Curated annotation (Swiss-Prot):
Keyword Heme found: no
Positions in coiled-coil regions: none
Keyword annotations of the record: Amino-acid biosynthesis, Aromatic amino acid biosynthesis, Schiff base, Transferase
Sample GO molecular function, one term: hydro-lyase activity
Lineage: Archaea, Methanobacteriati, Methanobacteriota, Methanomada group, Methanococci
Keyword Repressor set for record: no
Protein's name in the database: 2-amino-3,7-dideoxy-D-threo-hept-6-ulosonate synthase
Gene from which the chain derives: aroA'
Length: 272
């Protein structure tokens, strides 16, 4: 894949091929790590059901904490990639923006992971600790040939707008500079400004799905715009696992990301 030409680690390349579509060179990831931060949300009470639905819908990978492997494993062979999330923090904490490391790259390998992810809140009062973790874990990932996804979110006392193009661009660049292979961050809400974010980041960017949108059309149009602006995929949780038709919305996203179909055409995948 051309976007990974700068990666010389064969182990990383092999694993990246498992979570990126060969033809489109893009990915659809379904994060399911919300149980740690927010508790047993609707759509995640039985992770195996949700994993089955998104796999049937064509998602390239699911992302979650190591408990996802035990409670959400399909047992159907390799039909969907696995990304182990290494960071944790809860809404019950005095500082919800603080994320700590709760597992290791080696543990993720034992669990069969195709990649690991790390959460960094850029601008949080403890952001320097998360920067340190990202830098050190990127070295471990390099040693083991494990792709690293950095979730770079502008959040903190000085952040007035989490979608501000300048702060999103800074957050994305920061993640790439500290060693991440893939960046997950906010879509700015506008294709032109997001193009500038992409230009300023040497690592491919996957957009976050964000809070649940009012309509499917609104959400899918965001995905469409982001892909045309240079995004290399989408990582969407609540807009997928809390949907009435999890398989259908996953398939609709895949149609846009991998086949570049129009939103109206993609909406036909949703049956409920």
């Amino acid at each position: 894949m051309k976007m990974f030409d700068n990666i010389k680690n064969v182990g990383k390349l092999i694993r990246l091929e498992r979570i990126f579509d060969k033809k489109s060179e893009k990915t659809v990831i379904i994060p399911m790590d919300h149980g740690v931060s927010s508790g047993p949300l609707d759509g995640l009470k039985d992770m195996r059901i949700t994993t089955n639905a998104v796999a049937d819908g064509g998602a390239n990978a699911v992302l979650g904490h190591k408990g996802l492997v035990r409670h959400g494993h399909r047992g159907y062979g390799r039909d969907i990639g696995l990304i182990i999330h290494m960071s944790a923090g809860t809404s019950l904490s005095p500082d919800p923006n603080k994320k700590v490391i709760v597992t290791t790259v080696e543990d993720a390998m034992r669990l069969g992971a195709d990649a690991v992810s790390l959460h960094v809140n850029v601008g949080a009062e403890t952001d320097f600790e998360m920067y340190r973790d990202l830098g050190l874990i990127s070295e471990t990932c390099e040693q083991w040939g494990m792709p690293l996804i950095a979730m770079m979110y502008p959040r903190g006392p000085k952040i007035e707008d989490e979608k501000d193009p300048e702060v999103v661009a800074h957050a994305a660049r920061l993640g790439a500079e500290l060693g991440a292979d893939i960046i997950k961050t906010n879509y700015t809400g506008d294709p032109d400004t997001f193009k500038e974010v992409v230009k300023g980041c040497p690592a491919p960017i996957v957009i976050a799905g964000g809070p649940k949108t009012n309509t499917d059309e609104e959400f899918l149009q965001m995905v469409k715009d982001a892909m045309h602006a240079g995004g290399k995929g989408v990582a969407s949780g609540r807009n997928v696992f809390q949907h009435k038709d999890v398989k259908g919305i996953t398939s609709a996203i895949c149609k846009i990301v991998h086949e570049d179909v129009e939103v109206k055409e993609a909406l036909k995948e949703i049956k409920i």
